[in-house]
A protein has these predicted regions:
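Compositionally biased linear targeting/interaction segments
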Residues: 2-318
Length: 318
């Protein structure tokens, strides 16, 4: 009888332990779940804050672009800057706190680049040359770009139209119209990720058919030197050496760089411009100065006749 009572007490004790263990697990799981929900709610709140901070940066950039200015020039850190001929310089600070967060934005001059929609054959060919593309590839890519943007199905000597693209493993048609985004160039015959981004700058998520070692030249990439917007004229204050050489030739490019080092051009010269109207804005908002941020990219075109802007491109998912 005594042994039976002891056995029953032992079973009861074990059951109590099991219940306590189960309750402990449930409480721990509940606490963890609550902490996760609180953290998720806080992150969501900070993501919303970061988005609106980034949006405020875009609006600040637009306000700058709408100011009355006479010429643009390159700043050391924050892209293109605006100035008047009387020596007035627009505010240079493009990183500042707002509330508990922080905003940082950059303005990039799209007219410091070659407009791929209006560039001549010679200009495209020379851009490929200064970025390291072999001569045989230059002819193919140049003619294929011209075929992509023209409105007919007649192929250039080294180009490609529908009869080429429709035979690919994943077929598509030539656009026969202007490029809307730079990434469309990756669809053009001959343009590889290495040629587009630069051999050392291809994003990890971009498919590469050839290994890096297969390329003999150190391609610097054409993406940073071309645009799909703007008048097609080059801003001689903000254009890179490669763009200047592709547009004006080596000798004139060196003259422009030398004069630029002595002081910014305040009047148009060499067939270029000094006052741009098309810009890319990259704005980043940080919530509470923490790791959570949001980035917005926009291409803004300013009306030359009155203080109005047109948004040509908008991306909130960078």
């Amino acid at each position: 009888m005594l042994r039976k009572q002891i056995g029953e007490k032992g079973i009861a004790f074990i059951m109590v332990l099991w219940v306590m263990a189960l309750l402990t697990i449930l409480v721990t799981e509940f606490a963890y779940s609550m902490r996760t929900e609180v953290r998720a709610a806080r992150n969501f709140k900070e993501e919303i804050e970061a988005y609106y901070l980034a949006l405020s940066g875009v609006n600040m950039a637009i306000a700058e672009i709408l100011l009355e200015y006479d010429f643009n020039y390159l700043g050391e850190k924050s892209g293109v800057l605006f100035a008047k001929r009387d020596g007035t310089r627009m505010p240079l600070n493009r990183e500042f706190p707002i509330g508990d967060g922080r905003v940082s934005y950059t303005i990039i001059d799209e007219e410091s680049k070659i407009n791929i929609n209006v560039a001549s054959r010679g200009m495209i060919w020379d851009l490929l040359r200064v970025t390291g593309i072999e001569i045989e590839n230059r002819d193919v890519i140049t003619d294929s770009i011209l075929d992509w943007r023209d409105i007919n199905q007649l192929s250039q000597l080294n180009g490609a139209e529908d009869d080429y693209y429709l035979k690919l493993a994943y077929p598509y048609e030539a656009k026969d119209g202007n490029f809307d985004t730079l990434e469309e160039l990756l669809l053009v015959n001959g343009v590889t990720p290495e040629i587009f981004y630069g051999i050392n700058n291809v994003p990890l998520d971009v498919f590469r058919e050839e290994k890096k070692s297969a390329f003999s030249n150190e391609y610097s990439g054409i993406a940073e030197y071309v645009t799909t917007t703007g008048t097609g004229l080059i801003n001689i204050n903000t254009a890179s050496e490669k763009v200047l050489e592709a547009r004006f030739g080596f000798a004139v490019a060196n003259q422009i760089i030398a004069q630029r080092q002595a002081g910014h051009f305040q009047q148009p010269s060499y067939g270029g411009i000094v006052k741009s109207t098309s810009f890319t804005v990259l704005s980043r908002g940080y919530a509470q100065n923490g790791p959570i941020y949001h980035e917005i990219k926009a291409i803004i075109e300013r009306n030359t006749a009155k203080p109005e802007i047109k948004i040509k491109y908008w991306n909130e998912s960078i």
